[in-house]
Design a protein with these regions (language model features):
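N-terminal phosphate/diphosphate-binding loop that engages ATP/GTP or pyrophosphate donors
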Residues: 20-74
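Phosphate-binding/switch loop-helix module in NTP-utilizing enzymes
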Residues: 70-122
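The conserved Walker
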Residues: 11
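Conserved lysine of the Walker
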Residues: 15
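Alpha-helix C-cap/termination motif
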Residues: 25-26, 95-96, 127
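Extreme N-terminal starter segment of soluble prokaryotic enzymes
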Residues: 1-4
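Hydrophobic anchor at the beta1->P-loop junction of P-loop NTPases
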Residues: 7
């Protein structure tokens, strides 16, 4: 019986921190993805990058190839690159066959036009490997409800 944990909440409440600590404490083999906004970037639009969940923070590189979007003005302004989710996000989810837990940090509104990635998320949730996911607490993250039997 699969057991997934989806942690929902507003920005800054500690969803990602909780996931990181749970994985570290349990010493699990991890697959999946993490997205992270570059808070130190200059300009009004902050870049957001996607990384393999297994990659240590100090080894994460930022470049156009893993740029999934830019946000500004508390999410009211956004520029999203669904092709990065479709290519990298999907690959990170499909490469999880030997993992003990799949991390999805985080799921939100930015994936709305990334159809291949959304399908990969739903397929992962239909799988047997436990998922630990951070989910933005927003009305426009409805694609997770499409999965029928998914949590």
């Amino acid at each position: 019986m699969k057991k997934h944990i989806l942690i929902c909440g507003e920005k800054g409440v500690g969803k990602s921190t909780l996931i990181r600590r749970l994985v570290e404490e349990a010493r699990l083999t991890v697959g999946g993805f993490c997205t992270k906004m570059d808070e130190n970037a200059e300009g009004a639009m902050r870049p957001i990058y996607i990384y393999p969940a297994s990659l240590p923070t100090d080894q994460r590189k930022r470049g156009m190839e893993n740029l999934v979007g830019r946000c500004g003005n508390f999410g009211r302004q956004k520029e999203i690159f669904p092709e990065a989710f479709n290519a990298l996000g999907t690959a990170y989810l499909q490469g999880t066959s030997s993992c003990q837990v799949i991390v999805m940090d985080e799921l939100g509104f930015m994936e709305s036009d990334a159809q291949a990635f959304r399908r990969a998320v739903l397929q992962t949730l239909d799988g047997e490997t436990p998922v630990l996911a951070a989910v933005k607490n927003r009305m426009d993250v409805g694609f997770l409800r499409q999965g029928g039997g998914n949590p």
